[in-house]
């Protein structure tokens, strides 16, 4: 199922055309997919840049046209004995941490001359994609195990977890791991287990969504992972999209609660003792709705509006 398929399900369940997702999942992958509904679709631009964490299975000895188990096999190479050694695998994965450049898979949604790369690849065209920067923040090996490869033979699979920057292609990482280890490799399983501050345990299946749509709702402040303030004396200024002074907002720490509570107006609110940072994005609450996002300009000692909602984004059930 593609990310677009998920969007279509959400549109039907909520009876709302304005639905978007923050960060495409490969059709083969499972896990966290943040979906914005109604006015919350304007938050997409602020959610897609968050780092993500994956649990990935990498199987060695074969390469495929899509760099995962969905594509046709393009090459088979013998697998060095060291790949089956857990100590070697652990050291290799841990040393992947850092910055680098990678060429995205040709079967990706990147646009080349106005058309998606995977559409051109399916049409038999030769795709030349430029390398892009990426960063692995941390990486660890969970397991080295025997597995059944796409060709029906027994192979070696590394199961690892990685936290990566926006725009990192896990299929490219697996492909390049194989090349670096003098064989070839593909992604045999992939699950996104965190997106920003939202973890897998916060999410619900599509089946659960169909039964109880409110069970999937998450406070937008938690999804954004930013500090926030209640507009008590400055609500009118926020409504009009005016700039705010330092003294207008008393910041609170980012929310750490899981799914939204029956009323989130005061749930887990911890006052912040740190002053606003230059260019920091903060949320402003009016009547228990996320009414606006403001950016702090240190030189002017004021907050500048970046996104103001006409009715605001709901944070909790009406009590």
What are the residue ranges of the model-derived segments?
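Accessory RNA 3′-end/elbow-binding domains used by RNA modification enzymes
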Residues: 1-21, 25, 29, 155-157, ...
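Phosphate-centric recognition/catalysis
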Residues: 35
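Non-catalytic RNA-recognition surface used by pseudouridine synthases
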Residues: 1-30, 39-207, 299, 311-319
């Amino acid at each position: 199922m593609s990310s677009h398929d998920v969007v279509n399900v959400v549109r039907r369940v909520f009876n709302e055309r304005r639905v978007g997702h923050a960060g495409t999942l490969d059709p083969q992958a499972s896990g966290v997919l943040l979906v914005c509904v109604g006015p919350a679709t304007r938050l997409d631009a602020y959610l897609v840049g968050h780092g993500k964490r994956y649990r990935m299975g990498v199987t060695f000895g074969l390469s495929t046209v899509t760099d995962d188990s969905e594509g046709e096999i393009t090459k088979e190479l013998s697998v060095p004995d060291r790949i089956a050694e857990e100590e070697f695998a652990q050291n290799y994965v841990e040393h992947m941490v850092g910055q680098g450049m990678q060429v995205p898979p040709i079967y990706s949604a990147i646009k080349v001359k106005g058309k998606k790369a995977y559409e051109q690849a399916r049409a038999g065209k030769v795709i030349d994609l430029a390398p892009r920067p990426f960063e692995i923040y941390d990486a660890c090996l969970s397991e080295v195990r025997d597995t059944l490869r796409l060709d029906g033979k027994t192979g070696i699979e590394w199961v690892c977890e990685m936290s990566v920057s926006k725009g990192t292609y896990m299929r490219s990482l697996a492909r390049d791991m194989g090349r670096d280890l003098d064989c070839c490799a593909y992604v045999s399983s992939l699950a996104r287990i965190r997106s920003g501050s939202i973890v897998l345990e916060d999410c619900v299946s599509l089946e659960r969504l169909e039964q109880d749509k409110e069970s999937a709702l998450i406070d937008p402040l938690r999804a954004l992972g930013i500090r926030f303030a209640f507009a008590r004396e400055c609500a009118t200024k926020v409504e009009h999209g005016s700039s705010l002074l330092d003294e207008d907002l008393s910041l609170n720490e980012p929310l750490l609660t899981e799914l939204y509570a029956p009323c989130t107006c005061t749930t887990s609110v911890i006052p912040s003792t740190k002053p606003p940072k230059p260019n920091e994005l903060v949320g402003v609450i009016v009547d228990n709705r996320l009414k606006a996002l403001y950016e702090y300009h240190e030189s002017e000692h004021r907050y500048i509006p970046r996104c103001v909602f006409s009715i605001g984004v709901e944070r909790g059930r009406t009590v």
